[in-house]
Regions:
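Active-/binding-site microenvironments in catalytic and ligand-binding cores
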Residues: 1-217
Length: 217
């Protein structure tokens, strides 16, 4: 029997995912008390409303996030987002992930998930410090070897303390979606699972939260 492993953070009112971006505002558009007058059988309903930037919680970047002519969320191929064979690369000392840390792994046609353990700092100031990230050479290595989606449990797959974004540029330029702010990767085996991170089909947007998860058969 298959087992599901949740790899996503909970989205809560006011939480900060990325410094400088506003947290989400979650409220009732239609509350239960107000809805009661519309039904004769005692039924009540809540219709929620959320105001947020796309880069909230655990989210997926499509090529449109980086490139004006890249595929947006509505144009992504589901085959690259759901049921993808997965592999986990573990680098837990906080240092950058280089090609040598992935040598010997077959990543072609796979979801490559980078386990750094940085999610332990989620919703603390430390989360935005000197975080683990991929180098440009690691991005080249993954793109050249046919990875089809890449995820990380850190606050950015690039080094956000410099002004360049070579990893986003290389991976999204190769049509490889990126899933950031993941959690729970320590619960996965190195191999032998399938991965899913499917955003809603929104035209004209490059990023949106996902319920990232793994399926263990």
């Amino acid at each position: 029997m298959s087992r599901l492993i949740d790899l996503s953070h909970i989205i809560e009112d006011g939480m900060v995912t990325y410094k400088g971006l506003p947290g989400p505002h979650i409220c009732d558009f239609w509350d239960r008390e107000g809805s009661a007058a519309n039904y004769d059988d005692g039924s009540t309903f809540q219709i929620g409303r959320i105001d947020m930037v796309a880069n909230t919680g655990t989210y997926l970047d499509s090529p449109f996030h980086r490139y004006a002519d890249g595929a947006d969320l509505s144009e992504l191929d589901l085959a690259s987002l759901s049921g993808v064979p997965g592999t986990v690369i573990r680098r837990l000392d906080g240092s950058p992930i280089e090609p040598q840390h992935m040598e010997g792994r077959d990543v072609r046609g796979k979801a490559v998930l980078i386990h750094t353990g940085w999610d332990r700092h989620w919703r603390t100031d430390a989360y935005f410090g000197e975080h683990p990230h991929l180098t440009s050479e690691a991005a080249d290595w993954l793109a050249d070897r046919g990875a089809i989606i890449v995820g990380i449990d850190s606050c950015n797959i690039d080094n956000m303390h410099i002004r360049a974004r070579p990893v986003h540029t290389r991976l999204l330029g190769a049509g490889i979606p990126i899933c950031e702010h993941m959690t729970g990767l320590e619960r996965l085996p190195d191999e032998g699972f399938r991965f899913a991170a499917v955003p809603p089909k929104v035209k004209g947007m490059g990023t949106f939260p996902v319920r990232a998860h793994a399926i263990l058969d």
